Amino acid sequence: MRALTVLESVSRADGGIFEAERSLQCALVKAGGVEVRVVGLRDEFTEADAGSWGALRPRVAEVFGPKGIGYAQGFAGLLDTDVDLAYAATLWKYPSWAVLNWQKKTGKPLVVAPHGSLDAWALNNSRWKKRLAAWFFKDEQLRRASCFRALCVAEADAIRAYGLRQRIEVVPNGVELPDLSTTEDTENTEGKRRLLFLGRIHPKKGLVGALRAWADIQNSNSKTQNSKQWQFVIAGWDQEGHEGELKGLCGELGLKAFSSARQENLKLKTPSPEAADVLFLGPAFGMEKESLLRSADAFILPSFSEGLPMSVLEAWAYGLPVLMTPECHLPEGFASSAALEIRSGEEGGPGSDFSFQEGLRTLLEMSDRERALMGARGRKLVEEKFTWPKIASQTLALYEDLLGR
């Protein structure tokens, strides 16, 4: 079997979608039975991340004009017609148009993976641009899809709510299980415990509400036990200048913030990471990312909208207790007591602060053993449902079924 995989980016520029799709395509190759051909758009990280694809060698086309459109003159020529089917994890840019034309030309099965892009919150973000894309090509691409890959039941419901009636297969993301026989706490500052956020720093992640709640928890009048023994660590790549807004908010809230960018600390006026309530560490990949996960004591994702977040699965894989919103679409985490539920309210407004405070207070006042048991339940959940060999097997079975094999 030959499968064509169409992506917008084959590098870290696409954040968690890159991590998820690279891992899935590599797992399919490892499982055997399918030849995978990956195509995407070139960006500033394409060469740096090429080695992470292992035996796969993605082919890329150069983008001309605005990156938000992603037009690449040579892209259509990369879409092979001698494959059995195509899998597309792209909706809003030129590759969607190209794969639509490929499907019209070949008539072969097309699997579309929206990765949360059809959720109500995501559709309302940059609404006019998405309406234009829908009118020009996206809706036709969706109507021509043979099947949709939903990451969770909630995403399947969102696909149906968009008016699509084709087959939907729920195939979640997965993660690698790290060896936890060794621990790493050298990154901790003065023995402080770490609450980690790791991911794209974007308004939809709910960090405004989380910081407001953190400020209340860290307040000198707070009744929360052990609050001064913790730091809030925010690591990830900035989008739309939101990191700067969060740093400004720290100042307004009286939180001592420290940034890995030296010039920023002249503004933040926090002399050292040891003295900080909040650490901004910038993007983290590879070994640096692993080090952060190993040195963390808990994980938080207060998001307004997700497909199925890789970051939570990775946190569980490292045995971390998790604070997350229902919009992370991992209800099994709450059901198995691997996560505490917090509610995002409206864009981090007052309605969310109390929920965040309660969740943070519960986490901080738990004993080390209670947090460790919560993290262990998360790792067990990953072992049972979210490893890449399992996900690759589900995907391969879907491909074979679509081809009538």
Residue ranges and their predicted role:
Residues 370-385, 394-396:
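A short, well-ordered alpha-helix in the C-terminal region of glycosyltransferases
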Residues 154, 174:
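Carbohydrate-associated surface elements
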Residues 304:
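Aromatic "clamp/platform" in nucleotide-sugar-dependent glycosyltransferases that forms part
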Residues 39-45, 198, 231-247, 282:
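Glycosyltransferase donor-sugar binding loop
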Residues 321-324:
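Short hydrophobic beta-strand element within catalytic cores of glycosyltransferases
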Residues 244-284:
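Nucleotide-activated donor-binding/catalytic signature segment of Leloir-type glycosyltransferases, i.e.
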Residues 131-147:
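Membrane-proximal helix-turn-helix segments that form the acceptor-binding/catalytic region
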Residues 19, 23, 193, 197-218, ...:
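A conserved mid-protein helix/loop that constitutes part of the nucleotide-sugar donor-binding site
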